[in-house]
């Protein structure tokens, strides 16, 4: 919801401004609930579905930045750093059978947004130390979607699209001549190609996959 509020605030059309004004009170409530909840959240939720903490923080940060809500931005940033800064040598036990988020890559994308460039590069080297040799392999191979009419299995197309988004964003951590940038962008392209053609065609995916496709493409 906060991501929707952020997108509406970015648009200059009269319709967007009207919708943004209508949504603003609810966005403020969500912001306050984040501020109330984050101090209680001792541990992050690392699953590959709706409850993933890194995903929530990443989207909420968009709103905090666009709305100049420095209190929310600081709370989100400090919590993400506290949860994830000591994570090293990620094993990436994924995908799960109904994942639509990569726990590993979503964490890496979240940390990209809360650390400075130098600090993030150091953190990422520790978190994915074998990225230069495309390991863990599971992060580089698109998930197999065996039955797109199954609501849970169809989630895996979302996983491929969200991985494409994360890989493309993570690639920004390195200069253009760094081989790891090429590796990350290649992984993004591979995942996008695997699932973008299936955004439509089966209801179990087509009523939501377009949102993930937009993240992967924009």
Provide a role label for each language-model segment.
Residues 11, 114-135, 139-218:
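Terminal, non-catalytic domain-edge segments
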């Amino acid at each position: 919801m906060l991501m929707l509020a952020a997108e509406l605030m970015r648009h200059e059309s009269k319709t967007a401004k009207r919708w943004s004004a209508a949504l603003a009170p609810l966005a403020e409530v969500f912001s306050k609930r984040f501020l109330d909840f984050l101090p209680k959240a001792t541990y992050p939720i690392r699953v590959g579905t709706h409850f993933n903490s890194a995903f929530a923080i990443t989207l909420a940060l968009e709103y905090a930045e666009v709305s100049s809500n420095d209190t929310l931005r600081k709370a989100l940033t400090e919590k993400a750093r506290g949860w994830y800064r000591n994570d090293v040598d990620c094993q990436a036990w994924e995908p799960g059978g109904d994942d639509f988020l990569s726990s590993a890559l979503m964490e890496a994308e979240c940390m990209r947004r809360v650390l400075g460039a130098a600090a993030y590069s150091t953190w990422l080297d520790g978190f994915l130390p074998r990225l230069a040799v495309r390991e863990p392999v599971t992060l580089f191979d698109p998930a197999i979607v065996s039955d797109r009419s199954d609501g849970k299995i169809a989630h895996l197309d979302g996983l491929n699209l969200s991985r494409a988004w994360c890989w493309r964003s993570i690639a920004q951590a390195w200069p253009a001549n760094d081989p790891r940038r090429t590796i990350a962008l290649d992984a993004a392209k591979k995942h996008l190609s695997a699932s973008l053609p299936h955004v439509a065609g089966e209801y179990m995916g087509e009523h939501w996959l377009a949102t993930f496709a937009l993240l992967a493409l924009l």
